[in-house]
Curated annotation (Swiss-Prot):
Compartment(s) where it occurs, according to its Swiss-Prot or TrEMBL record: Cytoplasm
First-level EC class: transferase
Encoding gene (name): pfkA
Species: Streptococcus thermophilus (strain ATCC BAA-491 / LMD-9)
Main location: cytoplasm
Protein name listed in UniProt: ATP-dependent 6-phosphofructokinase
Amino acid sequence: MKRIAVLTSGGDAPGMNAAVRAVVLKAISEGIEVFGINRGYAGMVEGDIFKLDAKRVENILSRGGTFLQSARYPEFAQLEGQLKGIEQLKKYGIEGVVVIGGDGSYHGAMRLTEHGFPAVGLPGTIDNDIVGTDYTIGFDTAVATATEALDKIQDTAFSHGRTFVVEVMGRNAGDIALWAGIASGADQIIVPEEEYDINEVVRKVKEGYESGEKSHHIIVLAEGVMGAEEFAAKMKEAGDTSDLRATNLGHVIRGGSPTARDRVLASWMGAHAVDLLKEGIGGVAVGIHNEQLVESPILGTAEEGALFSLTEDGKIIVNNPHKARLDFAELNRSLANLK
């Protein structure tokens, strides 16, 4: 393989730049030319492709976001979009692609491989909700950023004796809420993977204050449950009488310089993706399990260890959907000093 390309797709995540850098530098060391594709699959279809060299990536390791930029491009799910993208790849003599992103990005990588262009997926998302890996690129940084913000909210909550509902990202998974909640000493953590009773939430807040055990109260809420304002309103409807505030950390969690762990993880995965493409291997996703790199087929059966399967009507389904660690939810309950 003489020429490969790299793109970032879906939501940005700290560490994506580190992965791109690793792909470029590893490929150059193997005598392979590298091209960057701007704005993910949209840029592929539109031919927004350019040559990358060591100088272009020399100062991106510590930068958040993705210097290749990203975009959601549902049109690539259709055959017409795929063929247009492949036509552009052929113009540049590109023979393989590294795709950094989430589940939707993996689906695109799978389609490219089916059309004869080996593609390797790297898990890039702050939500940590991609199957086939223990941790995703960007998760560690997102947790660190959320924890820092929650520490500051703890300060003001204590100063005024207030209750805070703090919303963090996590549309389908509660990993950020659980990890940042435990790290910041949250009193309650509400995640999509676990049912909750709003009356119990309010009872714990009330009894914490009345017993004198609590002078303030922090509830960390994953966005996949509902928004902080709506949750706070439900608390009031259920009889909460505390001085209640709602806040949303929002996109702040996505930004910022990646942690050392995210940089190392992204670099390790990016270099390995080049090794796979050099061998002509595509249709796989790289992950980490028990601190070792692993590879999983993107499409196949659950028995084969594949991440996704196709139903008889052609619908893509996840074989083993990601679930946040609910033992961490139990851990937090044991530490919150609430009955």
